Amino acid sequence: SVGFKAGVKDYKLTYYTPDYETKDTDILAAFRVTPQPGVPPEEAGAAVAAESSTGTWTTVWTDGLTSLDRYKGRCYHIEAVVGEDNQYIAYVAYPLDLFEEGSVTNMLTSIVGNVFGFKALRALRLEDLRIPPAYSKTFQGPPHGIQVERDKLNKYGRPLLGCTIKPKLGLSAKNYGRAVYECLRGGLDFTKDDENVNSQPFMRWRDRFVFCAEALYKAQAETGEIKGHYLNATAGTCEEMMKRAVFARELGAPIVMHDYLTGGFTANTSLAHYCRDNGLLLHIHRAMHAVIDRQKNHGMHFRVLAKALRMSGGDHIHGGTVVGKLEGEREITLGFVDLLRDDYIEKDRSRGIFFTQDWVSMPGVIPVASGGIHVWHMPALTEIFGDDSVLQFGGGTLGHPWGNAPGAVANRVALEACVQARNEGRDLAREGNEIIREASKWSPELAAA
């Protein structure tokens, strides 16, 4: 009988299509699939494709009202993971029409919205996404990008230096502003609100913004350099967030900050649009990322969150350090650092990059190295991250035995010494400690650090 038949059927009959030629407009995903015992990998891969696109658990008569061939996700390739028992990489292609233009929120809802709780899978991890130009062009992307930021700040040929103001909670606004001033006066380019500083009883946001702006202008006048403080605009509602961003602009602040995962992509994209329209730089913190990306076999790899952020919009994003207190492997980290900064990134599995990604001149995002780093790490950081980065020393600045400003001086001297040594052709990896020692002869602040 040709007619409609109800009943449960295998996904792989419809959604596993190994001979499919991927289109240039498809969004491609690489999933790490761990099927339940007894579930063949093709069925598991097809189930992922189905549940994250057009499928449901049974045949429904309304399937006849649409063209599945046009709209279904397809699992087009499966490979076993070397060295892992019962783990596979399933490659899925999604037709562009499944996604709303300019909405990271909708893209993630579709691709990772429902399928991660699926019974046939023991675990599932989204390792990488290929965003086609046809889709990325519907996004504004970062408000300004790397070159525009350098021109705004008038700082070239070196990484930028930042510092998170500690203790992160408990300072009054006036004392907070004082710490900001000391760090900037000492030689840092930026200071930063901690990600959990929003507007608490001991320091309301407006007071903090005012004192930080005062610190900025004073440090700028005394050093002749442009300074910034990441004013955290993250709030409980989008309206309140925008209110804070507007106030930052009225104070003449150059940069605001947002926690993009806890704040959400919808809020983040709105803020990014405001920042471009009003000449504010946007610093992005990735609070909550480890909840999503730390498990090796379940969740989402940070490189996906990084790509999503570049589409949603941000000028800086925290991306691990390779050397500090938080986890991050060197090649993998450099992989997503390139995905953030570069225009065109070749597929390279050794760096965790599953697809060639062409951003077609979408502005880049500056990676921020932050967390447990101090002056002895400076040569390594300069070498690993290169010029287009922000190196952030929190305790590494404020923990200086002589105080905040000397701590800032020590960091700036160390950075300038490393950049000069690199430009003279010296090997930072080998001679790093020696370079820092030489510099400390001329800088008592660095010697004390």
Curated annotation (Swiss-Prot):
Residues annotated as site: Transition state stabilizer: K325
Predominant subcellular localization, coarse grouping: plastid
Modified residues (N6,N6,N6-trimethyllysine): K5
Residues annotated with N6-carboxylysine modification: K192
Any single biological process term in GO: photorespiration
An example molecular function term from Gene Ontology annotations: magnesium ion binding
Residue runs in coiled coils: none
Any single Gene Ontology cellular-component annotation: chloroplast
Cell compartment(s), UniProt: Plastid, Chloroplast
Assembly and binders: Heterohexadecamer of 8 large chains and 8 small chains; disulfide-linked. The disulfide link is formed within the large subunit homodimers.
Role noted for this protein: RuBisCO catalyzes two reactions: the carboxylation of D-ribulose 1,5-bisphosphate, the primary event in carbon dioxide fixation, as well as the oxidative fragmentation of the pentose substrate in the photorespiration process. Both reactions occur simultaneously and in competition at the same active site.
Protein name as annotated: Ribulose bisphosphate carboxylase large chain
Organism (species): Zamioculcas zamiifolia (Aroid palm)
Classification lineage: Eukaryota, Viridiplantae, Streptophyta, Embryophyta, Tracheophyta
